[in-house]
């Protein structure tokens, strides 16, 4: 019994929360960017192309959903007054800009206080209405598991294996085949796999919007090795391979922790499952409320013994050895350590509109937490969008 979101972009609204200290002069001009049915990167590329601004001069604090109406800030370095006038009030069908002021510092990724959401949830059944009040109370009193959401996994949902696993084994051709043929369109996936190593045929079949991937195949056609062809990809795309696998590992740590030590309900998530506590006592919460789980436990050691046991078991089950954690391939480290809070608490969680088969919710989340994860917990249900 899945709930549904994003049936229209207007049904998923996100506004970035950030205190701006702006003035009348400065090296960086700040704009409010409002967009609809468009990724942040596509919006920034459009602005760069339309106004002749180098991409590196445009800063933003986070990537916002595509199928949504979103508001976020961007900073643009070294703009003259004429260009600011042209950009202020600029609008297309999918985006609009509003000039706000200046600063001596540009925006960088992660520099926000949080995100405010208004979301219409459809497909609400009697089961969901029975579950929701109890889960809402648990979330308000305690919190929600801080799993990584779908956005961290890219095309993994259509892949057989994580690309990092192939790279660890130096299987560069298999890694490349997984990357270039993991598509939702099963027929196209089959045709691409059949055309493997016939690069002219392969190029003719590829989606035309896949620019970095097209360049990789052209490099293979020129005779580059599979290993070297990976280097044609921009570093941020290569790093996505790392983020996807590390997000999966971290989600597995938290899932195992919840299933082993707490009362829970499970929901489907891509090709896996997530578990959410559906009961809690003050005594247990006091023990786990500040729990932080490292990504690897190399530089950052787990301070919770139960989390440490779970991490060791998951890494062992995945066949990841301490030596592998130091591995470098295709110009990047395949693993990097850090810590992440196990739980987050949304602010201002409210039902702002109720209909027979739908609810409209509003809430504010801290940076790095996912609305789709919160919705899975609130309804103990998968989320389709």
From Swiss-Prot:
Responsible for synthesis of pseudouridine from uracil-13 in transfer RNAs. Keywords: Isomerase, tRNA processing. It is an enzyme of class 5 (isomerase). Signal peptide: none annotated. The active site is at residue 65. The keyword tRNA processing applies. It catalyses: uridine(13) in tRNA = pseudouridine(13) in tRNA. This is tRNA pseudouridine synthase D. One of its GO terms (molecular function) is pseudouridine synthase activity. GO terms for biological process: pseudouridine synthesis; tRNA pseudouridine synthesis. It comes from Aquifex aeolicus (strain VF5). PANTHER family: PSEUDOURIDYLATE SYNTHASE PUS7L, TRNA PSEUDOURIDINE SYNTHASE D. Belongs to the pseudouridine synthase TruD family. Its EC number is 5.4.99.27. PROSITE patterns: TRUD, UPF0024.
